[in-house]
């Protein structure tokens, strides 16, 4: 995750702003600079290489002292920054909005995946600039539309029916912020269209999840899509979701947190996110993740719980 101010800076033109991507040498200069405390939140002028991000975001970049940040010296950083600028320059951002826009926390990996989709000649985003920009505006939280299959970050499709598409995420192969844990495995489920889904299509998805992904929890980050994650990583997801929710509220980015379909979401996660929306503390909310929940009655008649062992997936064991 990183703020949009880590990728670009605003330049006032007439009554709105044009956004310009940072170059890696300007960032490198900022990372070595001594800056007064009172100037930590201001864009840094490297003199030689142009404007750099505010020093308060130093931890967002990979350095000798911080290996968890972005690999900003890779070509992928520039591609992501340029893509963000293209999207922001396609809309009008006024002086009253610019600070709020640049403070938005976005998924770096999501944006890298959109770059990969853009570069794939077989992908619809390669052929449609309009759909590409729409996908980016959704990814950076500017659009109120949800991420559907056409505008999704992408990955490897492992399941699809008339209503849903399930993707295996390819973060292990990323350049900007790769997942380093080689045991990482995670999926995302997007709706093919933002409209009501028939019960039969929900039933098909639940059956697929129950038999092929029985070692995973279905959760949501509140953005209109589902994530299918290992139970061992649920607490980590909870920390991130809670932090992003609080940050967005603090900065005035009051995007609606979408709880999604309770029949699909893991019961404990639904309880966690509901509690978070009510304004409870992280500790209070997280307790619900480890609490034994009363088992819901089967919402679908005919969805059997009987299955032969050789038909049950061992993925995630």
Curated annotation (Swiss-Prot):
| Stored InterPro entries | Rota_NS35_C (IPR048306), Rota_NS35_N (IPR048573), Rotavirus_NSP2 (IPR003668), Rotavirus_NSP2_C (IPR024076), Rotavirus_NSP2_N (IPR024068)
Q: What class of enzyme is it?
A: hydrolase
Naming one, the record's GO cellular component terms include:
host cell cytoplasm
Q: Name one Pfam family in it.
A: Rota_NS35_N
**Official protein name in the record:** Non-structural protein 2
Cite the residue spans of the region called RNA-binding. Answer: 205-241
Q: Which UniProt keywords apply?
A: ATP-binding, Host cytoplasm, Hydrolase, Magnesium, Metal-binding, Nucleotide-binding, RNA-binding
Question: Which family would the database say this protein is a member of?
Answer: Belongs to the rotavirus NSP2 family.
Report if keyword S-adenosyl-L-methionine is assigned.
no
The UniProt annotation places ATP binding at 107-109, 188, 221-223, 227
- Location in the cell: Host cytoplasm
Q: Tell me the active site.
A: 225
List the signal peptide residues.
none
């Amino acid at each position: 995750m990183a703020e949009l101010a880590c990728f670009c800076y605003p330049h006032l033109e007439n009554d709105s702003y044009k956004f310009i991507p940072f170059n890696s040498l300007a960032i490198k200069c900022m990372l070595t600079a001594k800056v007064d405390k009172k100037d930590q939140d201001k864009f840094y002028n490297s003199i030689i290489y142009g404007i750099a991000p505010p020093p308060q975001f130093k931890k967002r970049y990979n350095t000798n002292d911080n290996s968890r940040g972005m690999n900003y010296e890779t070509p992928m950083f520039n591609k992501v920054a340029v893509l963000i600028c293209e999207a922001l320059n396609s809309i009008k951002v006024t002086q009253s909005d610019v600070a709020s826009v640049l403070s938005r926390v976005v998924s770096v990996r999501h944006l890298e995946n959109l770059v990969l989709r853009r570069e794939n000649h077989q992908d619809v985003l390669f052929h449609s600039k309009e759909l590409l920009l729409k996908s980016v505006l959704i990814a950076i939280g500017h659009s109120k539309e949800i991420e559907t299959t056409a505008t999704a970050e992408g990955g490897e499709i492992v399941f699809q029916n008339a209503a849903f598409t399930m993707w295996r995420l390819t973060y292990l192969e990323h350049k900007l912020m790769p997942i380093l844990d080689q045991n990482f495995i995670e999926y995302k489920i997007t709706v093919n269209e933002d409209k009501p889904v028939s019960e039969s299509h929900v039933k098909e998805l639940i059956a697929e999840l129950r038999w092929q992904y029985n070692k995973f929890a279905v959760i949501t980050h509140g953005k209109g899509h589902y994530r299918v994650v290992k139970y061992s990583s649920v607490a980590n997801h909870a920390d991130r979701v809670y932090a992003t929710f609080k940050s967005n509220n603090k900065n005035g980015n009051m995007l609606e947190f979408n709880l999604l379909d309770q029949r699909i979401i893991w019961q404990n996660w639904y309880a966690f996110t509901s509690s978070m929306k009510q304004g409870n503390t992280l500790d209070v909310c997280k307790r619900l993740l480890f609490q034994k929940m009363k088992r819901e009655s089967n919402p679908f008649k005919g969805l059997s719980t009987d299955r032969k062992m050789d038909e049950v997936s061992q993925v995630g064991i």
